[in-house]
Curated annotation (Swiss-Prot):
Subunit structure, as described in the record: Heterotetramer of two alpha and two beta chains.
Any single biological process term in GO: L-arginine biosynthetic process
Cell compartment(s), UniProt: Cytoplasm
Stored InterPro entries: Arg_biosynth_ArgJ, ArgJ-like_dom_sf, ArgJ_beta_C
Reactions performed catalytically: N(2)-acetyl-L-ornithine + L-glutamate = N-acetyl-L-glutamate + L-ornithine; L-glutamate + acetyl-CoA = N-acetyl-L-glutamate + CoA + H(+)
HAMAP family in the record: ArgJ
Source organism phylogeny: Bacteria, Bacillati, Cyanobacteriota, Cyanophyceae, Gloeobacterales
Binding site for substrate: T154, K180, T191, E278, N401, T406
Site (Cleavage): A190, T191
Presence of the UniProt keyword Cytoplasm in the record: yes
The name this protein goes by in its record: Arginine biosynthesis bifunctional protein ArgJ
């Protein structure tokens, strides 16, 4: 049983945070497209970024900023425009976005982080952000997480948020988050953006370590289409407003509980991103055991979840376990094929490298009737374990992406 409980509230569950979202006119549809999350007090700040060499201007801006300072107060996010592959003008637009909101909030510009998502290669209409800044600051509230979550969406069908709370050092500590992502999802920190807030008092370096590990277990273990975005980014702020004794020791129970909370929020958001994958009809959870370490297991799991053949079989309700075995074998992790066991839900398909007789029609019915499909692979006697999440590949995915800018 977890030492924390799930609650509502998203990024405003944590004390001291306000959030909101408005329509600035960036999206031609008129939907909300500008979000703000902020705390009056500087917060310990952590960032995890895309590994794509073609990086959006906000990614480079935040990376450089957080290399120089450990705290930030605000995150500004626009949707409908990625501000990626936009050259010098894009860099200047990211800087001006921070400056505009710094003035509206009464902060210094180096306390404001920025993020963008949308179409790549189109100049960011900074004048719309300039005009909307004060209205967004005025609209931000202590219950505004849902409005912010809506304003960061692009091809997403649903907003994604969650929060947890627990007692740490005798104080109630909250961790909450919002995320967006539906296509171009194969993070190696899709477009995938995630924003985490906490009111925990924690050492900055420790906070960054916790966030990095939580990202590895969650957002770096999901895939929709194998494409890593130019804009993938997770930003996490910890305000200290819970007034718990500051967590300094990475080996302490308090640090362990905080990491559990951050990881739980990240995993929940990551699974919601995959479930909302473009054209997806089911979530695929791939569990791998028996490797030499957890990193190897995670690598195999993500390779299987990423396989277009596996994803197509899941969409077609085809229990083609050979595709699962083949994907595991090309993951680049050594294991003995004679030890491989494969299970689909409750159906044992392969044991000690040998195929098993199973009810193919019943297995197909399991796929047809499940919105979450569980795949289990045992590759050896090791203690390594790993999980990855993917979704099926449907006709609608091609349709959505064939017509994205037309």
């Amino acid at each position: 049983m977890a030492d924390f409980e799930w609650i509502d509230g998203g990024v405003t569950a944590a004390k001291g945070f306000r959030a909101g979202g408005i329509a600035s006119g960036i999206k031609p549809s008129g939907k909300t497209d500008l979000a703000l999350i902020y705390s009056e007090n500087p917060s310990a700040a952590a960032g995890v970024y895309t590994t794509n060499l073609v990086q959006a201007a906000p990614v480079a801006y935040n990376r450089n900023l957080l290399q120089q300072r450990g705290k930030a107060c605000a995150i500004v996010v626009n949707s409908g425009n990625a501000n990626a592959a936009t050259g010098k003008a894009g860099e200047e637009a990211a800087i001006e976005t921070a400056q505009v909101f710094a003035r509206a909030l009464g902060f210094s510009a180096d306390q404001v982080l920025v993020a963008s998502t949308g179409v790549i290669g189109v100049p960011l209409p900074i004048e719309k952000i300039r005009t909307a800044a004060q209205a967004l600051v005025d609209a931000a509230t202590e219950t505004g997480s849902d409005a912010a979550a809506e304003a960061i969406l692009t091809t997403d069908l649903v907003a994604k948020s969650c929060a947890v709370r627990a007692l740490i050092g005798g104080k109630t500590v909250h961790v909450g988050g919002i995320a967006k992502g539906s296509g171009m999802i194969h993070p190696q920190m899709a477009t995938l953006l995630a924003f985490i807030t906490s009111d925990c008092s924690v050492d900055i370096d420790l906070w960054r370590q916790i966030v990095a590990r939580a990202t590895d277990r969650s957002f770096n273990q999901i895939t929709v289409d194998g494409d890593t975005s130019t804009n993938d980014m997770l930003l996490a702020l910890a305000s200290g407003e819970a007034k718990n004794p500051r967590i300094l020791d990475a080996a302490s129970p308090e640090a362990g509980l905080l990491e559990q909370m951050v990881s739980a929020v990240c995993v929940d958001l990551a699974k919601k991103v995959v479930r909302d994958g473009e054209g997806a009809t089911k979530l695929i959870e791939v569990q791998v055991a028996g490797t030499g370490d957890d990193a190897q297991a995670r690598k195999i799991a993500l390779t299987v979840a990423s396989s277009s053949l596996v994803k197509s079989a899941m969409f077609g309700n085809d229990p083609n376990w050979g595709r699962l075995a083949a994907a595991a074998g090309r993951a680049g992790v050594e294991f003995d094929p004679a030890a491989l066991a494969v299970r689909l839900g409750a159906f044992a398909l392969m044991e000690v490298g040998q195929p098993l007789a199973f009810d193919r029609a019943a297995a197909s019915d399991y796929l047809k009737g499940s919105d979450t499909v569980e795949v289990h692979l045992q590759v050896g006697p090791g203690t390594g374990n790993g999980i990855a999440w993917g979704c099926d590949l449907s006709y609608d995915y091609v349709k959505i992406n064939a017509e994205y800018t037309t």
